[in-house]
Regions:
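Major-groove DNA-contacting interfaces characterized by cationic-aromatic clusters
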Residues: 16, 44-48, 181-252
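Catalytic-site neighborhood detector that most strongly recognizes the C-terminal catalytic loop/helix
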Residues: 91-92, 99, 150, 159, ...
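Long, amphipathic, Lys/Arg-enriched alpha-helical "connector/arm" segment
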Residues: 21, 38-48, 91-117, 126-129, ...
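Flexible interdomain linker/hinge and immediately adjacent N-terminus
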Residues: 25-26, 76-109, 242-243
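Short, basic (Lys/Arg/His-rich) helix/loop patches that form interaction surfaces
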Residues: 35-39, 110, 114-115, 127, ...
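Conserved tyrosine-mediated DNA breakage-rejoining catalytic core shared by Y-recombinases
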Residues: 104, 137-219
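N-terminal DNA-binding recognition helix of tyrosine site-specific recombinases/integrases
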Residues: 4-5, 13-21, 25, 35-87, ...
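Short pre-functional
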Residues: 65-72, 118-135, 152-153, 280-281
């Protein structure tokens, strides 16, 4: 977020020079900015269709939260005398924060027949994993004997699709692997890279149902390879197609949207909303232990988590 939504616009300004007017003007610019305008700090060439999809108010609200944290440190270090942010933060769109309660999550999960989608949704709901983190997992990240047999999952990589012009300018130390293109002339590549932030590196505990599903999935992968060894190309990822190639983020999104369209009985949320639902449920169960939940979700700071999910603390008082 810093690299793509802050640095390109105000990154060349000295912190002492920034005034409230500058920040308000910056927010106004972001409100007119297409999603994906910058990737890894590199400006992208967008299609007319892509240009119409603007940044959400929630993204701008998250930028405000990051700036608030940064400026607070600047005040503490005597670099500035006061925080130059507007009194009122940009309001996040409540529709973008639609979440499911635990009963809805369980009911929805029981309707998913696609085994790969079922596992991905299960992991997002239970472990608060991002889509790229799920697809970035490898079998070696699973330890079924750890934690006295409970089992753990190590999160240290993320998968994403990147335009090749952006990939050329990306620090090679950030990229673990670039997958071969499935089509000639492709303008983008599927990559395995370091996660969003250092806090995103974390070890999570399996639940019993999660452990059972993971073991069954690994058995399926083994069976797929045995069924057609001459056509199988093991990409090394946990989430693979029957031919061994990686499941790309756009394919997982397609499957999720198809399932969502087939089940209008559930309140419509995007895939990332499953992570929000999970984090909200964890906060309610832990009675607002933001620091503990941050360790599970991988948010950069507890402050970011708190700002995003503080509304969940009203639920127990309203019941």
């Amino acid at each position: 977020m810093v690299q793509n939504l802050i640095v390109p616009y105000i990154g060349n300004r000295k912190v002492q020079e920034l005034r409230t007017y500058d920040i308000e003007k910056f927010y106004a610019t972001l409100a007119k900015t297409p999603c994906g305008q910058y990737v890894h700090g590199v400006k992208q060439t967008l299609t007319n269709k892509q240009k119409k999809r603007l940044l959400s108010s929630t993204s701008i609200h998250e930028v405000h939260t990051l700036l608030k944290t940064a400026f607070s440190y600047a005040v503490e270090w005597d670099l500035i005398h006061k925080i130059p942010l507007p009194r009122e933060a940009p309001k996040a769109n409540s529709e973008e924060r639609t979440i499911w309660d635990e009963k809805t999550m369980l009911a929805a999960l029981q309707t998913i027949e696609n085994p790969a989608l079922h596992l991905a949704v299960h992991m997002s709901m239970i472990l608060s994993l991002r889509e790229g983190e799920i697809l970035g997992l490898q079998p070696s990240d699973l330890d079924f004997d750890a934690a006295d047999g409970r089992g753990t999952i190590s999160v240290s990589k993320t998968m994403q699709r990147a335009n090749k012009d952006a990939l050329e300018k990306l620090d090679p130390n950030q990229v673990y692997h670039t997958f071969p293109d499935r089509r000639e002339g492709s303008k983008s590549s599927l990559i395995l890279k370091k996660p969003k932030t250092k806090k995103s590196n974390r070890v999570l505990y399996m639940t019993k149902p999660m452990k059972e599903e993971l073991l069954a999935w690994l058995e399926k992968l083994k069976q797929d390879e045995q069924n057609a060894p001459e056509k199988y190309s093991n990409c090394g990822q946990l989430f693979r197609l029957p031919d061994g190639l990686p499941i790309a983020p756009e394919l997982l999104t397609k499957w999720y949207r198809q399932w969502r369209s087939a089940h209008p009985e559930f309140e419509q949320i995007v895939f990332h909303g499953l992570r929000h639902s999970s984090a909200t449920y964890q906060l309610l169960q832990s009675e607002g232990d933001f620091k503990s939940v941050q360790g599970n979700t991988g948010h950069a700071t507890a402050a970011v988590l708190m700002d995003t999910y503080a509304h969940t603390q009203d639920k127990p008082r309203l019941n």
